[in-house]
């Protein structure tokens, strides 16, 4: 089975079991950390990812590490290990290991166990009155639903004060202590100090108690899980964050909020986000606070919905990152929410905008419980309000709770739309126009062999809507893999947008098109040799 095909499973809290059993089973393929492993950032570690064809992740890597290094963490589900070098090891030693291990069979990637940070911007001492729920029209949504407690939002962040006066009633009691602590590797995600406020504040925005005569109004009354992956200082390791994402999906979270970023592109984090998306979870993340810089990861991954920040006047926040990955905008400047201990404060950052969008997603899913994650994502796009910013600043627009709840996802918000747009060629069924291209090649190993071929393909139909890339290789004795990019860059085995890699030499990738893509294709030899035929079928409407 390929990993690039989204399953779009509708999550309806599939693991609502007894607390202790739910917590035990929820850790699935996440191995315990080595005793004594320091929490938080892990600059001395290298993460090594392996092919999903191997039977044991740890055994595959163990024989390939230097004698002064050790495997300190394993995640069999995501297929990676963390290899720790001594703190006094030369930087070049780690770089040499990353380069050399990539030459080994079944090794997919090697990268630093980077540090990600909370995306909070320090606020002024003057705090404005709460405005975020009003800006996204929560009142109209609340007339229909305050949020269903069967809808679960997992907050991957610092710990949440789960007994906070305005959060306790919305914590998901199906899991012991309402979550898991990946920083300290224990079952209690409670914050360790009063200053560890970020997770409590973010959680209070998405699912703080509403209409309960207490404190502030959160966006929704959906249930909430705390996946503590960032430590007291606001930083967290790549492996802890990836494990927290996987765990959240395995717990049945419908929505994962990630108000964090800053570590750059990571195969491990990309795989974790794609894993959760394939499990049916909608992932929402903060765009970043680099004052107009490019969208940070994990928000920039295809599987994640990136959210920019607005101020009270619906202008783009000065700190907000922008770019083509932005899908929604939401209020993020001076947002009032809960903080430790049973207190309240206003904070600013795309960290605050992301949980607003996550909370609206929770309201929408409460009103339309049959939606898959893909359908929910599209519905939030369709019901967003254009506030006059550029696409790179607002994406589809400012998220709107009332429209997301009251608009029928099947019919849209205007019954006359179909009649008005009958002549729009983009509204035809996908497949009215077809273009097919083929190429033949041969791959072989050894000295002077040809281990891979690359191709580029420009869309040619009037309104491209779908493409299928098919690789037909030798019937036996060879294993070929197929990689695809959507922006014209040349794909590699570590830089791609879609991939298909099975045993054997026949692969296929299907992708929906918006019309502005240019396909880059890599046919790569994993084992064996032989001839192949590459076929691209483009459909237009």
UniProtKB/Swiss-Prot annotation:
Residues 410-432 have a biased composition (Acidic residues). Its main location: secreted. Dependent on high salt concentrations for activity and stability. Strongly inhibited by the serine protease inhibitors diisopropyl fluorophosphate (DFP), phenylmethyl sulfonylfluoride (PMSF) and chymostatin. Also inhibited by denaturing agents such as SDS, urea, and HCl guanidinium. Activated by thiol-containing reducing agents such as dithiotreitol (DTT) and 2-mercaptoethanol. Residues 403-453 are annotated as: Disordered. Residues 1-33 form the signal peptide. The keyword Ligase does not apply. Disulfide bonds: none annotated. GO terms for biological process: proteolysis. One of its GO terms (molecular function) is serine-type endopeptidase activity. Residues 130-405 form the Peptidase S8 domain. Induction: Expressed and secreted during the transition to the stationary growth phase. Is probably up-regulated in response to factors (metabolite and/or regulatory molecule) occurring in high-density cultures. Exported by the Tat system. The position of the signal peptide cleavage has not been experimentally proven. After transport across the membrane, the propeptide is probably processed autocatalytically, yielding the mature fully active protease. Keywords: Hydrolase, Protease, Secreted, Serine protease, Signal, Zymogen. Transmembrane segments: none annotated. Monomer. Serine protease that hydrolyzes large proteins such as casein and gelatin. Cleaves preferentially at the carboxyl terminus of Phe, Tyr or Leu. Is also able to catalyze peptide synthesis under different salt concentrations in the presence of dimethyl sulfoxide (DMSO). Belongs to the peptidase S8 family. This is Halolysin-like extracellular serine protease Nep.
